[in-house]
Amino acid sequence: MLRWAFHRWEEALHNRSNDRIVREFDWGLDWLPDLASRDVAADTDASAQDRLDAYAAAAVADSDAFFASTDTAEFDLDRQGHLRFPSQVVTPHAENNVVHARLYRAPEDRGRAVVVLPQWNSDADGHVGLCRLFNRVGITALRLSKPYHDWRMPAELQRADYIVSSNVGRTLQVCRQAVLDARRAVGWLHGQGYSSIGICGTSLGSCLSMLTAAHEPRIKVAALNHISPYFADVVWDGLSTRHVRQGLDGHVSLEALRRIWLPISPQPYLERMRRLQTLLVYAQYDLTFPVRLSQSLVQEFRTRAIPHQLAVLPCGHYTTGKSPFKFLDGYWLTRFLQKTL
């Protein structure tokens, strides 16, 4: 009965948005400028799917190169705490090529800071309350705008469709961009004297946070809020991405999509999390990050004996943002970071 009630509530909250667009399928090879330069993908007579398969396999095999980040000196922090810096990845949209972040300083942070990545389609105020909650326990927070979100969204968009869509190559590249942006944000915090740095992400932000933590040695702890081992499976089976699935259907199988999007999935990088302290959070009645996927990732951590803490929310995905569940979620995230940073 309780499951049925939460699922009905989740569906109702999902249906409040009527601006979702089913976009045309595209392999998106033009979004991967280094595709032709990789020997494994250089056979231009191969099909688009085969080329992306080879590209993804090479990216996972050398993920340090795929997610290699270069620091920049071009940071601009204004008096309101708005930080801007150039993205390492250049896309066709000028707005998206400038990274925006908002700094929330804790009065006595003792060198502790966390990069915060909100959920997919969050607006500019998403997770600001959480940042201020972190401030209350002495942790400075840097709230990062993901690619194609809020300040970075071109006029042609109403939603952040270009980071998760039926354009396969674009999704791969823009999620990679998000990780490189987060690594530059960590570099800025480190340059400001912060010695104990964590990362906290929700939903899509959680996936990107784990990818960042797995490849950024300056990150010590990761709080992952809504979890799955595979990017493709969430898009394929999740409530929030039904319209994306519609654009994919008939063009690519789940198995093929899982292979192509493996570089932006947590699964290949689990062993890299062994050096960190990690909090895994999932919701018991989640339809967007299906519970079987969340439990699968938890089991992977357990089987491999990777250090972690676990919290299970008694709600769904959308309802995590509703009272009283948002307070419980915030408490678990804050307590974890307070104890581990």
Predicted regions span which residues?
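Proline/glycine-enriched tight loop/beta-turn segments at coil->beta junctions
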Residues: 94-99, 105-114, 136, 273
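Cap/lid segment of the alpha/beta-hydrolase catalytic domain
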Residues: 116-176
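Gly/Ala-rich beta-loop-alpha elbow adjacent to hydrolase catalytic centers
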Residues: 201-205, 209
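Hydrolase active-site cap/lid region
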Residues: 210-256
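N-terminal targeting or regulatory segments adjacent to alpha/beta-hydrolase or S9 domains
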Residues: 1-84
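Conserved acidic catalytic loop of the alpha/beta-hydrolase fold
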Residues: 179-195
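The feature captures the conserved acid-bearing segment of alpha/beta-hydrolase catalytic domains
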Residues: 237-293
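C-terminal catalytic histidine-bearing segment of alpha/beta-hydrolase fold enzymes
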Residues: 295-341
